[in-house]
Design a protein with these regions (language model features):
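Hydrophobic core
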Residues: 17-19
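Catalytic cores of phosphodiester-bond-cleaving enzymes
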Residues: 116-163
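A residue-level signal for conserved active-site and pocket-lining positions in enzyme catalytic cores
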Residues: 137, 184, 284
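Surface-exposed substrate-engagement region within the catalytic domains
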Residues: 159-276
């Protein structure tokens, strides 16, 4: 081997190790950064009288999960909240823990390094800048409270004082009712605000909530084909108030299990081709959402 070639090889290995030490590793190398395709106001040309159930809407699974444990488990997204919104994401899957009376983003035991105050600030700024848009914000109590003397909902209410928040227990009927609003979907027990989505939520299956929201959330699978079949089945569901189709999954029949990065590598390229077959797409929640996902999602429906 020539000396020049050897130097290039050593430099390449060194660069890879630097990426690993910076916390990019497997997940970071897999994730694509957006080229900033702007879908920040894609709802502006949708008629006010369009029923909410008839609007195809992209979303992100575990919206704030940008960090992981050992670069293996925890991360589900590579784009910031602002980038996701500007790229067209309109369903946010926000998962929180109450700690010392403050709400912070977590994914399981992983601290996602974002306060709910900073999250709501960014969402409010986006909606005020883009009043043609609406957002559905699912809020899940991801972990039990610690060192707190108020309830999860008491804390939540303190962040939702702006009139942009739609906290009725009933879904808006039309886009007109929801424009410029953030519609709250409540995934925590004993909620008194927001559209209830805690009672009846089942683990790793497809189900219909009491308010006729259909959910496909089969995340424990043994093959990519199993997950693909579940996604297609949800596309074919008709007549529900809403339908929410999670693309997230991990395969349980291996060691270590395949987490979000490798599952997204299987599902995202496939869904970019498959989704064109369906006009009634409902709400589709992506892991590692990218510009190519959004271009494929909106093709033929905008």
């Amino acid at each position: 081997m020539e000396l020049k070639t050897l130097r290039i090889t050593i430099a390449s290995v060194a660069s890879f190790l630097i990426l690993l030490s910076a916390g990019l590793g497997f997940t970071g190398l897999l994730s694509q950064k957006s080229n900033n395709k702007d879908y920040s106001a894609w709802m502006k040309n949708i008629d006010d009288n369009t029923a909410l159930r008839d609007i195809n809407m992209p979303g992100s699974h575990d919206t704030m999960a940008l960090y992981s444990i050992g670069d293996l488990a925890g991360q589900c997204q590579s784009l910031s909240l602002e980038d996701q919104l500007n790229l067209g994401v309109r369903f946010l899957d926000i998962r929180l823990k109450l700690n010392k009376n403050e709400l912070k983003a977590v994914h399981g035991i992983v601290d996602e390094r974002a306060s709910f105050a900073s999250i709501t600030e960014k969402i409010e700024s986006f909606v005020k800048t883009n009043p043609s848009e609406m957002i559905i914000m699912s809020v899940k109590e991801e972990a039990n409270a610690s060192s707190s003397n108020i309830s999860f909902e008491e804390s939540l209410k303190s962040y939702l004082k702006s009139d942009i928040y739609y906290t009725s227990e009933l879904l808006p009927n039309t886009l007109k009712e929801a424009r410029g609003k953030v519609v709250l979907l409540s995934r925590y027990p004993n909620s008194t605000i927001g559209i209830p989505a805690y009672e009846g939520w089942q683990d790793s299956t497809s189900f219909t909530l009491p308010n006729d929201i259909y959910v496909q959330d089969t995340y424990k699978v043994t093959s990519k084909e199993q997950k693909q079949d579940e996604i297609i089945s949800c596309f074919n569901e008709k007549g529900h108030a809403l339908k929410i189709n999670f693309l997230s999954a991990y395969r349980t029949n291996g060691f270590p299990p395949s987490y979000a990065p490798s599952s997204a590598n299987d599902i995202n390229p496939w869904i970019n081709e498959e989704i064109s077959k369906y006009n009634d797409r409902g709400i589709v929640l992506y892991d590692f959402v990218t510009e190519s996902n959004m271009q494929a999602f909106f093709k033929g429906v905008l």
